[in-house]
């Protein structure tokens, strides 16, 4: 059994998780990363994706996050999300709205840099949609 550490997932609305966990997989901007006890100190940005939490009791919980930051230290990990919700509580209409807004942002972009950023965000959202919603 892996050693537990403190994990907190915080959104502007509320504290979603504050407990001892075995591991957390977070969608870092440079790729997914697994955090465990005694992890080297890191601060990273979070892209839209799924956070998978393996609890100290052996269960698994999944949360959708829409950007933010993760502060990782040897004793724990705090993820400050721009928006977060449990996968089981995902609102399909809200996700569809976010995807539509991202499509409009890409179409309305004034320059190549803005278009590229909007298209990247749209790609992340559609990948997220495929990962959490059944066909």
From Swiss-Prot:
Cell compartment(s), UniProt: Cell inner membrane
Keywords recorded for this protein, A-Z: ATP synthesis, Cell inner membrane, Cell membrane, CF(1), Hydrogen ion transport, Ion transport, Membrane, Transport
NCBIfam families assigned: ATP_synt_epsi (TIGR01216), PRK00571.2-4 (NF001851)
Entry function: Produces ATP from ADP in the presence of a proton gradient across the membrane.
Quaternary structure annotation from Swiss-Prot or TrEMBL: F-type ATPases have 2 components, CF(1) - the catalytic core - and CF(0) - the membrane proton channel. CF(1) has five subunits: alpha(3), beta(3), gamma(1), delta(1), epsilon(1). CF(0) has three main subunits: a, b and c.
GO cellular component: plasma membrane; proton-transporting ATP synthase complex
One Pfam family in the UniProt entry: ATP-synt_DE_N
Transmembrane stretches, start-end: none
Membrane topology annotation: Peripheral membrane protein
The protein's name: ATP synthase epsilon chain
InterPro entries, alphabetized: ATP_synth_F1_dsu/esu, ATP_synth_F1_dsu/esu_N, ATPsynth_dsu/esu_N
Major place of residence: membrane
CDD domains in UniProt: F1-ATPase_delta
Family: Belongs to the ATPase epsilon chain family.
Listed PANTHER family: ATP SYNTHASE DELTA/EPSILON CHAIN, ATP SYNTHASE EPSILON CHAIN, CHLOROPLASTIC
Record-level Gene Ontology MF annotations: ATP binding; proton-transporting ATP synthase activity, rotational mechanism
């Amino acid at each position: 059994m892996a050693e537990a550490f403190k994990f907190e997932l915080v959104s502007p609305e509320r504290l979603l998780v504050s407990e001892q966990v075995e591991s957390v997989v977070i969608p870092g901007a440079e790729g997914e990363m697994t955090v465990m006890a005694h992890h080297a100190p890191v601060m990273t940005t979070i892209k839209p994706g799924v956070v998978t939490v393996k609890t100290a009791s052996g269960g698994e919980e999944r949360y959708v996050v829409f950007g933010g930051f993760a502060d990782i230290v040897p004793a724990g990990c705090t993820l400050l999300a721009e928006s977060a919700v449990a996968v089981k509580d995902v609102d399909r209409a809200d996700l569809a709205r976010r995807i539509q807004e991202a499509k409009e942002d890409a179409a309305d972009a004034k320059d190549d840099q803005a278009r590229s950023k909007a298209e990247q965000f749209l790609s992340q959202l559609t990948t997220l949609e495929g990962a959490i919603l059944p066909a």
